[in-house]
């Protein structure tokens, strides 16, 4: 078993553009993957552990260039008072042999696949000529989203508006100083920002009520609430609601009142036109799929599989055919870095 840390993953220099390509590739596999619903337990109050399993399809059936069929399960946790409070790890298996191949720190994977999904969804659903993107919540997820947006379309110039919060907007702009295809404006009022946006991406992790008035969400806007918070008012008024998985949103309070719903993967596959008018208001809920996590993990594992410098752990298994313990070598690579 290989132990793969975040530091080692980052050292691979995986570009945001490649992350976008992996997201498109993984969405194309969704119909053939086994993707059970997430399971969560709650030790106390807002603390949680969430398990996210996924069996990728046999590569022979998809044309994806994997060396083997993979199963993986990501464990996400949030513990109040822990440092960091939010983290995730992923176990990757050979689906044919049951061998545990790797234990990975999956914080980088989670951030970048989330950003790539937002970028892909925004491009697929935005109106004709859209160029103004607005962001609220300017942490790592927002940065990953904009990195993927800019690098996936280097020929396109973007106007990006940021909601002011402490010094986060200024620091956010500094991160993108090297990019020539973007200009920034900092705004103080979220409704004013929304009115001027073609695409509104929210990366806040908590909200006690609606963030933006319905009147500020003008015809043609695309809203992507990355962490699902603050836009419940859109559920009954918007022309279309998209999601990464039906099971993720069918429990929403107003699901039965959606005017039109489908999965974003159907849009990416060309089975659904997505936006049919530049006047439509569209919201896309991407709750997060283990499909993406396991695809990223498999790609990373195959990039590192032959790297002898990575820490490996030998697993000792007891066989049913003998009373003695027999060594069954299980090369697992685990990379852990917070």
Task: Describe each region flagged by the PLM.
Residues 134, 159-161, 185:
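A structural signal for isolated positions on well-ordered beta-strands in alpha/beta enzyme cores
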Residues 149-153, 176, 215-216, 304:
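Active-site catalytic pocket residues across diverse enzymes, especially alpha/beta-hydrolases
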Residues 10, 230, 234-323:
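Adenosine-phosphate binding glycine-rich loop
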Residues 182-256:
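Rossmann-like adenosine-cofactor binding region
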Residues 1-111, 119, 126-129, 262, ...:
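N-terminal ligand-binding/catalytic initiation module
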Residues 152-176:
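NAD(P)-binding Rossmann-fold cofactor-contacting core
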Residues 118, 129-150, 164-168:
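Glycine-rich adenosine-cofactor-binding loop
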């Amino acid at each position: 078993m290989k132990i793969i840390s975040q530091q080692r993953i980052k050292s691979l220099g995986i570009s945001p553009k490649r992350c976008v390509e992996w997201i498109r590739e993984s969405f194309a596999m969704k119909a053939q993957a086994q993707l059970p619903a997430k399971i969560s337990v709650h030790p106390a109050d807002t603390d949680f552990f969430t398990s996210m399993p996924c069996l990728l399809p046999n590569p022979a059936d998809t044309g994806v260039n994997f060396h083997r069929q993979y199963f993986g399960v990501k464990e996400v946790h949030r513990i109040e008072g822990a440092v960091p409070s939010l983290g995730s790890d992923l176990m990757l298996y050979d689906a044919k042999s049951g061998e545990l191949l790797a234990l990975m720190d999956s914080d980088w994977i989670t951030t970048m696949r989330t950003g790539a999904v937002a970028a892909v969804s925004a491009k697929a659903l935005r109106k004709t000529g859209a160029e103004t993107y607005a962001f609220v919540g300017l942490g790592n997820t927002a940065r990953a989203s904009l990195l993927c947006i800019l690098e996936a379309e280097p020929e396109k110039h973007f106007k990006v508006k940021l909601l002011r919060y402490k010094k986060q907007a200024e620091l956010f702009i500094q991160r993108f100083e090297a990019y020539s295809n973007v200009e920034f404006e900092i705004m103080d009022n979220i409704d004013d920002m929304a009115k001027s946006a073609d695409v509104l991406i929210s990366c806040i992790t908590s909200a006690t009520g609606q963030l933006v008035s319905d009147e500020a969400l003008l015809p043609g806007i695309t809203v992507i609430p990355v962490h699902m918070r603050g836009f419940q008012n859109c559920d009954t008024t918007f022309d279309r609601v998209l999601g990464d998985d039906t099971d993720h949103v069918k429990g929403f309070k107003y699901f039965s009142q959606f005017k039109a719903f489908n999965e974003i993967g159907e849009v990416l596959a060309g089975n659904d036109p997505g936006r049919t008018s530049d006047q439509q208001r569209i919201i896309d809920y991407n709750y997060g799929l283990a499909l993406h996590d396991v695809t990223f993990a498999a790609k990373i594992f195959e990039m590192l599989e032959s790297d002898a410098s990575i820490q490996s752990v030998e697993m000792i298994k007891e066989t049913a055919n003998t009373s003695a313990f027999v060594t069954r070598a299980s090369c697992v690579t685990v990379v852990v870095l917070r």
